[in-house]
């Protein structure tokens, strides 16, 4: 297991209690036997980059699963739904960590990171489904999917009687 994967795995034990913060980052580095300096080399912004890498790894896993289970006979909307459900199922494995990540990403200073994360996920989904559009549709597909994904995540991670 790489240092990056080890830090993510260890931090997931602490995030539900402490959130994605300096304390979690320091505890993860200490438990992994990595100095804070080495940790900062891997994640220059500390817990923020650790959180974004955690999300990115789940996004990459979702793309692998979607590509491997691709059913070209389905309509695009069904394939998009499958991709979204796959991503939500992956988030379910660490729901509280995802909830804490979304809380952090909703802060004003995190808007650029949040926008990039949502855009990259939308782009990855459309690319994994073989989107070949080159006109304005390229943008509208990604913006629309990003909006749907963001709304779905907010609903999914919000506290409710279902929990």
Regions found by a protein language model. Give the residues of each.
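Amphipathic alpha-helical packing segments from all-alpha helical-bundle domains
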Residues: 109-131, 141-150
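Hydrophobic alpha-helical connector segments
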Residues: 65-100
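Domain-scale activation on soluble regions of proteins
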Residues: 2, 100, 104-117
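Short, amphipathic alpha-helix enriched in basic
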Residues: 2-37, 45-52
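Short, basic, alpha-helical segments at the C-terminal edge of helix-turn-helix-like DNA-binding modules
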Residues: 55-61
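Hydrophobic core segments within long, regular secondary-structure runs in both alpha-
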Residues: 8, 48, 81-88, 119-126
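Conserved small/polar residues in nucleotide/adenosyl-binding loops
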Residues: 156-163
